[in-house]
Amino acid sequence: MSFLNVFSSRPTPKQVAKDRLKVILIHDRGELSDEVLDKIRLEILDVLSKYVEIENEDVDITVTKSNAIEGESPSLVANIPIKNIKGKAR
């Protein structure tokens, strides 16, 4: 029977279940609550403020879906305008 499976193009139930689970996990990981996203934003800004001056009002941090090798995966995208670099000799 295994000889016939080599020529079969139908995925096994195991592979179908695995693919479905991947899709569910990717979807769940990409859904961040506003509270979690705000915490991430504050921590990123706290670290960056040690090294550069930034405009907090102009910061845009979002979660998007990007195409990866195996479907879509979530990506954290940050647009943070820098006013000045701290400690830079002029």
From Swiss-Prot:
One of its GO terms (biological process) is cell division. Pfam families: MinE. Keywords: Cell cycle, Cell division. Belongs to the MinE family. Prevents the cell division inhibition by proteins MinC and MinD at internal division sites while permitting inhibition at polar sites. This ensures cell division at the proper site by restricting the formation of a division septum at the midpoint of the long axis of the cell. This is Cell division topological specificity factor. The lineage of its organism: Bacteria, Bacillati, Bacillota, Clostridia, Eubacteriales.
